[in-house]
Amino acid sequence: VACEPGEWRVLGDLQQACDASGVALELLADTHFLCSRDEFARWAKDRESLRMEPFYRRMRASAGVLMDGGEPVSGRWNYDADNRKGFGAKGPGRVPEVPSFMPDAITRDAIADVARAYPGHPGSLASFAWPVTRRDALRALEAFVRERLPAFGPTQDAMWNGMTVGWHSMLSAALNLKLLDPREVIAAAEAEYRAGRAGLDSVEGF
């Protein structure tokens, strides 16, 4: 019995191990995902092509995200065309800092283990400051929606020399580690729009 993995590779490894051992593999649904495999299969059945935009709209509508009744807020499904601006000659201006978190004891032990096992590998963990607890992940989410989300949309694809993060959320690791639920991240972003603190272009783009 295993929780449904989020990668085909891992699923294949599990199935191979079970087959080799003569054990039946029973998968439990991973509720972290917004759409189950069965639900996606029903949506995809009999479609000539699988495109992101129709699926995105279906998920928005079914979850009621940025919706006004049965229609998207403002009448537009996406703001991609508006969110490809550059910074101009003066550059991005002041970019809010991403919060950093002091490694806890478990993380410090893991860093030491990596240093011992892979001393010659590239990179360094000396400045590791990612959230590794639920509490820190929530702090990272709050910092993003309040400080960087409002300016995220229009220049989300823009780059500038020396700018490493810009206004991006840096929440993917916390989501992948399941320190954050995608539903609460979506709700937090939408709440900023509903409260008038972030524009629809930024919130929908995120």
Tell where the protein language model's regions lie, with residue ranges:
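Functionally constrained cores in energy, signaling, and assembly domains
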Residues: 1-2, 148
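Beta-rich, aromatic/charged-enriched effector core domains that present basic-aromatic interfaces
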Residues: 2-129
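Catalytic cores of enzymes that engage adenine nucleotides and/or redox cofactors via long glycine-rich
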Residues: 83-206
